[in-house]
């Protein structure tokens, strides 16, 4: 929370909101420091929070019912290093007792375009059909998206598009190096611009993937 101070300065204070979550402003009061926030994460369904920004207090008002058992699951945010040395953050959701021997079936996804920010979100299907059964899920924040501002987006435009594909491959290589998974156990998925990403990865780095799910892709870029 940023507060104006005398002399044109601003002070800031952190709110104790959940880590590794997507926070959105639902509504505010023009005549007070009160607001309602939406909090969404990989393991917790969307919840409504009341915030008194002046007092710095938070209260969870209500939460949608859970659709899968998140007990024993955890979320980490890690970084891979792309070909040009840029650090590429990614989220991984997995069981607490994961074996670091490359045996965990893993789904890796990303978008990487149009300033779209890929942030934590609750997916009943992913949780029930994949995470509950021992799989890991990875969301990569590659360049081309809007997660870290205009420069992050512009770093993957036009003649710099290859950086996006290098970023995605770097995340896969990092997962394999950390032994979360292995090429035979690593599947990738993406749609639309993410489908184009999958098509490129399938052709450029086929040795990294055990399965590729290409959804509504833009593949014929010469006539697009």
Regions found by a protein language model. Name each.
Residues 23-224:
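Serine-hydrolase catalytic core recognition
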Residues 4-8, 53-54:
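Short loop/turn segments that connect beta-strands within beta-propeller blades
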Residues 2-5, 33:
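C-terminal closing repeat unit and adjoining cap/tail of repeat-based domains
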């Amino acid at each position: 929370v940023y507060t104006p101070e005398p002399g044109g300065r601003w002070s800031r204070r952190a709110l104790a909101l959940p880590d590794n979550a997507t926070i959105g402003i639902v509504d505010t009061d023009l005549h007070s420091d009160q607001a309602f926030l939406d909090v969404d994460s990989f393991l917790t369904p969307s919840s409504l929070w009341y915030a008194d920004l002046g007092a710095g207090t938070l209260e969870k008002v209500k939460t949608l019912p859970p659709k899968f058992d998140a007990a024993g699951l955890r979320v980490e945010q890690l970084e891979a290093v792309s070909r040009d040395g840029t650090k590429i953050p990614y989220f991984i959701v997995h069981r607490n007792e994961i074996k670091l021997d490359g045996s965990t079936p893993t789904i890796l996804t990303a978008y990487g375009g149009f300033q779209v920010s890929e942030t934590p979100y609750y997916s009943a299907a992913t949780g029930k059909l994949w995470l509950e059964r021992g799989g890991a899920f990875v969301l990569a924040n590659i360049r081309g998206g809007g997660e870290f501002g205009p420069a992050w987006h512009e770093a993957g435009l036009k003649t710099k598009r290859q950086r996006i594909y290098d970023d995605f491959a770097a995340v896969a290589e990092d997962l394999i190096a950390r032994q979360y998974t292995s090429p035979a156990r690593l599947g990738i998925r993406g749609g639309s611009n993410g489908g184009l990403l999958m098509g490129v990865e399938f052709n450029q780095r086929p040795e990294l993937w055990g399965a590729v799910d290409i959804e509504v892709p833009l593949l014929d870029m010469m006539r697009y």
